[in-house]
Amino acid sequence: LTTGGIRGGKKQMGEYYPRSFNMGITKKVFQKTGGYRIPFMGEDLEFSIRIITAGFKTVLIPNAFVYHKRRTNLMQFYRQINYFGRARINLTRFHPGHLKILHLFPLIFIVGFISVLVLSLLNQNLGFLGLKCYVIYLSLITAEALLKLRSLKAALYTPLTTLIQMSGYAVGFIH
């Protein structure tokens, strides 16, 4: 119910673009593409775009295990997501056709949320209706997390982490 599906999971919402933390390539792919070209945010996704453009196929191996460091606090998570938002803009400069409407969802979410808060000050009824929509959305995310994770503690964190995810990406995107 958030934007996680666009990053690449078992259920693809489009072409699979591997990230460097779980990417394996052949020598032929490296030689034809030249490997990483740019030392900036989103370099792995930029490389994946060039791999696919060069005619190579990318696949997700669902049974492969990848261990990587998770962010250990919410501020680190915010910084990482903010970085992803800024990376999306950098990628769009190199590959304009790869900005999708779904990439705008966090920005729309946060602009809408701020608008609802302002609207609440101007018209309580309309503001309440808007806030109700956000509460329903966050409740659905919490319920989905509870069903998937089977952990009440983790599920109760999802509204907060969703707001951090959306705001971090949106701020990075417009930065």
Regions found by a protein language model. Give the residues of each.
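Short glycine- and hydrophobic/aromatic-rich loop-to-beta-strand nucleating segment
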Residues: 15-28, 45, 109
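Membrane-interface anchor segments at the N-terminal boundary of transmembrane helices
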Residues: 97-108
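Short loop segments at secondary-structure junctions
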Residues: 27-28, 55, 115
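Short, flexible, basic/aromatic active-site loop/helix in glycosyltransferases
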Residues: 1-17, 21, 31, 94
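Generic alpha-helical secondary structure signal
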Residues: 20, 25, 76, 80-83, ...
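Catalytic donor/gating beta->alpha subdomain of glycosyltransferases that bind UDP-sugars
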Residues: 31, 37-99
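Membrane-embedded multi-pass helical conduit in multi-pass membrane proteins
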Residues: 109-175
